[in-house]
UniProtKB/Swiss-Prot annotation:
Gene Ontology CC annotation, any one: membrane
TM stretches of this protein: 176-193
Parts of the chain on the Cytoplasmic side: 1-175
Compartments where located: Host membrane
The organism's place on the tree of life at top rank: Viruses
Protein name: Protein MGF 300-1L
Family assignment from sequence similarity: Belongs to the asfivirus MGF 300 family.
Keywords: Early protein, Glycoprotein, Host membrane, Membrane, Transmembrane, Transmembrane helix
Chief location of this protein within or outside the cell: host cell
Extracellular side: 194-268
Record flagged with keyword GTP-binding: no
């Protein structure tokens, strides 16, 4: 993997440094064994490994950016999906690629088309495409609503993948009955929920997703776990009830279809 330039890194990190992005970057780094760049939040020392923590009194390292493979294909993809030309150019490797980038044919892409492509990247297990969508999420051209939908999809996918996503894909490929798949689906999400109960205190951005999983299992202790207001609890419960009613208790062909259905109906 090739490093982004220092200038590009600082530009992206300064604009988009937040907890949600940090957790996504961290899991992307684990998932694809990318090099990662850490920065000490106290002395601003930068190191390409986490060994900096041994050299500094401040142990609170902030994961700045996963180093993404840059090429013209990624650049053109970002551009065709609606990223600004300035943002897309950050992923060109050299001047020649920048010159080859035709910014005159930038098509307006609907939210539904972007989410459809994102879903296909899940189903095809296309790692570079998924990373590209994450980068697209950082582009400032998109509406807040679409940004949140994309973020929800990616968080969902990555955590599921860390749990037992590959196992699910094996079952899915064997054409098990819908009822069997549903049992497997619940088993996966129960493991996911137990992990989220621990993670949500560290990453508050996952709270809504934790509600979703908790109420799916009718776990009333979710209220105590997250110390939330009554209004927050009621809002989430109502959304889950609506989702269960609309999808027949979420009898979906796969976890991917399930998450895509949420994003398409603007529940989050």
């Amino acid at each position: 993997m090739v490093s982004l330039t220092t200038c590009c890194l600082k530009n992206i990190v300064n604009q988009h440094a937040c907890v949600e992005n940090t957790v996504l970057l961290y899991h992307l780094g684990l998932r694809w064994n990318c090099k990662t760049l850490y920065q000490c939040t106290q002395c601003n020392g930068v190191n390409y490994t986490n060994s900096h923590s041994d050299q500094c009194k401040n142990k609170d390292l902030f994961l700045m950016k996963v180093i993404v493979k840059k090429n013209l294909a990624v650049t053109r993809t970002l551009l065709s999906w609606g990223a600004s030309p300035e943002y897309a150019r950050l992923f060109c490797r050299n001047t020649e690629e920048e010159q080859a980038l035709n910014v005159q044919h930038v098509a307006d892409v609907s939210s539904s088309k972007i989410l459809e492509r994102l879903t296909m990247s899940y189903k095809e297990n296309d790692e570079q495409l998924l990373i590209t969508f994450y980068l697209l999420n950082l582009s400032t051209k998109f509406s807040t609503n679409l940004r949140e939908q994309v973020r929800f999809n990616i968080v969902s996918y990555i955590i599921c993948d860390l749990a037992i996503h590959q196992t699910f894909k094996t079952f899915y490929a064997k054409n098990y009955s819908l009822s069997t798949l549903y049992c497997i689906f619940l088993a996966i999400y129960y493991k996911l929920y137990t992990a989220l109960r621990k993670m949500v205190k560290i990453y508050p951005g996952l709270k809504r997703f934790a509600y979703l999983i908790g109420f799916m299992f009718d776990d009333e202790t979710v209220m105590e776990t997250y110390n939330s207001t009554d209004d927050e609890i009621s809002e989430c419960k109502n959304r889950i009830i609506a989702i269960k009613g609309y999808y027949g208790n979420i009898h979906c062909r796969s976890d991917i279809d399930h998450m895509y259905a949420f994003s398409q109906n603007d529940y989050w």
